[in-house]
């Protein structure tokens, strides 16, 4: 394995007082060529390019009866004869009298579509401020206890979360979606703070952090079988409904509402649903399918207890706040709400800030304080993407102390910084005019984030024991850009850590790119070669496709977070601190 200091998928990265970095071993790197990846490659690695959010153009309503296209050509004298305009390829602007509420000119909260733009950072400052002010107005108008649906100290009813989901599903306004989530989460904090974590996890359609590797792994046919067995309908009827409706969640809502029950089941709770789904995800081994179906039936049998046997019009309000609908959608891995995780981050931040102010007897935080809190929460999550760690910390220490107690740490993979595509190199140079920046090579490989803790430092990172592999050399693992554990795919890399890492190194998190490597010709092989490696149960001695690891960023070193140190400064110093003089 060779170790070189070069690049990831970010072609250009801003750095101050920097110069282009060179390979540690002096070899000339081979540039990667952008190309379409296969489905397997997309699943295993994914692109390092941030997707471009497209914003739908909406026609504005004008009171003038005549609507004309604007032209850049010189204005000609108007003729008294009536003009016959050629049909325009653009959609015609409707007359004011014909405009429906959906077609009206977008207001501030309508300007963004959650299904089209999921990046909260795209919000303009004035739009973000209006969003916060709108949320504050709702808080002031709602009184002391908005939406008091359950008694304080009792478990959060799953029906209450489904009501919030339904409100979110009925709008495409991202700011309104954020308000619904914020107000509900504030209610959870006030009445049942112990259920705050599972509530947030169900909102983002996850049972645990990505690096935990917990997946439901349930196919559509298995879900349909469970719905049929639970509601007494044949599989053929369920399949026919699915073909007609196209949404298995609505099929479940329809089936459950038409099923009479003799005894009313105990209402579902958020924690109960989360634990039930987690139990389904952890089922393995012989007879696992039957056990999963049994777990699904248990949840569906207790769902929608108040409407069971009464029939529900699934064409009204998109099926309404049906518990069965959202349980099945969660099992499918798609809630279909248009609820981005970044929106939930903002909602959590606002709910926490408002709750803390209420406990302290203070006024509702100002727009500036809200914005500062949101930035802190986003920053902490980007560095430590684990709600299991952040949520308990924020409840114990408060939002503004999070940066002190929640920092990047070995064992929890940090999310990668994605590149933002540009149309040309001149656009990049114009954007960075007057600044020094570092250019690096793009390798045709797979992102690899290497975590390491030496044996005598394990006690400093107790959480790492649960996520990193342990051997006589300490704790170590490799994570993908999607936080998937790749340790079983690259045992040859982990097996050689002690041959290129200095013995006095206590801990590090190293961002790298692994590429297929020709050991004889000393050159990078095509990406397709790398994808021929087995993903599981790989033995180092059986590896046929050798790899070269190009290190390009040191995020954490000997207890010190270095993710905010300029890249060029890291490149100049981290090689001599981390690597042996002659990497093997």
Please give the residue ranges for each predicted region.
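N-terminal nucleic-acid-engaging modules of covalent nucleotidyltransferase systems
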Residues: 1-583
């Amino acid at each position: 394995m060779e170790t070189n200091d070069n690049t990831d998928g970010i072609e250009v990265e801003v750095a101050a007082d920097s110069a282009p970095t060179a390979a540690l071993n002096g070899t000339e790197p081979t540039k990667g060529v952008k190309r379409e990846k296969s489905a397997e490659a997309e699943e295993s690695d994914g692109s390092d390019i941030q997707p471009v959010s497209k914003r739908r153009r909406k026609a504005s309503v004008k009171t003038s009866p005549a609507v004309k296209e604007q032209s850049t050509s010189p204005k000609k004298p108007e003729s008294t004869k009536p003009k016959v305009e050629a049909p325009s390829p653009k959609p015609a602007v409707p007359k004011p009298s014909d405009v429906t509420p959906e077609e009206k000119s977008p207001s501030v909260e309508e300007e963004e579509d959650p299904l089209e733009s999921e990046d909260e950072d795209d919000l303009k400052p004035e739009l973000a401020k209006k969003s916060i002010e709108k949320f504050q107005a709702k808080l002031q108008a709602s009184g002391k206890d908005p939406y008091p649906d359950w008694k304080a100290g009792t478990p959060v009813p799953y029906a209450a979360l489904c009501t919030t989901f339904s409100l979110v599903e009925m709008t495409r306004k991202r700011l309104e979606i954020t308000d619904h989530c914020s107000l509900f989460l504030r209610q959870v904090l006030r009445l049942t703070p112990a259920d705050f974590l599972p509530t947030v996890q169900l909102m983002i359609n996850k049972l645990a952090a990505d690096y935990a590797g917990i997946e439901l792994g349930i196919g559509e046919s298995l879900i349909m079988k469970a719905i049929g067995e639970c509601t007494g309908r044949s599989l053929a009827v369920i399949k026919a409904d699915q073909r007609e409706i196209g949404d298995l969640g609505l099929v479940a809502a329809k089936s459950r509402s038409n099923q009479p029950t003799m005894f009313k089941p105990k209402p579902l709770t958020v924690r109960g649903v989360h634990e039930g789904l987690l139990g389904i995800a952890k089922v393995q081994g012989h007879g696992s399918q039957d056990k999963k179906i049994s777990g699904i039936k248990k949840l569906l049998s207790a769902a929608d207890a108040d409407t069971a046997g009464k029939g529900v019009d699934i064409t009204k309000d998109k099926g309404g706040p049906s518990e069965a609908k959202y349980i099945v959608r969660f099992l499918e891995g798609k809630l279909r709400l248009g609820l981005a995780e970044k929106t939930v981050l903002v909602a959590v931040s606002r709910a926490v800030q408002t709750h803390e102010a209420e406990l302290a007897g203070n006024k509702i935080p100002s727009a500036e304080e809200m914005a500062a809190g949101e930035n802190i929460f986003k920053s902490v999550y980007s560095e430590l993407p684990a709600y299991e760690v952040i949520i308990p910390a924020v409840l114990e220490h408060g939002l503004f102390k999070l940066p002190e107690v929640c920092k990047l740490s070995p064992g929890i993979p940090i999310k990668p910084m994605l590149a933002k595509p540009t149309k040309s190199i001149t656009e990049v140079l114009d954007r960075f005019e007057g600044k020094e920046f570092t250019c690096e090579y793009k390798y045709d490989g797979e992102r690899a984030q290497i975590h390491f803790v030496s044996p005598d430092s394990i006690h400093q990172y107790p959480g790492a024991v649960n996520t990193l592999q342990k051997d006589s050399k300490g704790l170590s693992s490799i994570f993908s850009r999607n936080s998937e554990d790749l340790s079983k795919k690259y045992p040859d890399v982990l097996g050689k850590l002690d041959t290129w890492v200095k013995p006095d190194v206590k801990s590090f998190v190293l961002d790298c790119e692994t590429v297929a490597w020709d050991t004889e010709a000393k050159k990078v092989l095509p990406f397709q070669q790398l994808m021929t490696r087995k993903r599981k149960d790989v033995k180092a001695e059986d590896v046929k496709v050798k790899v070269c690891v190009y290190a390009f960023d040191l995020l954490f070193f000997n207890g010190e977070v270095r993710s905010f140190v300029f890249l060029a400064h890291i490149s100049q110093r981290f090689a001599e601190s981390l690597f042996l003089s002659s990497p093997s």
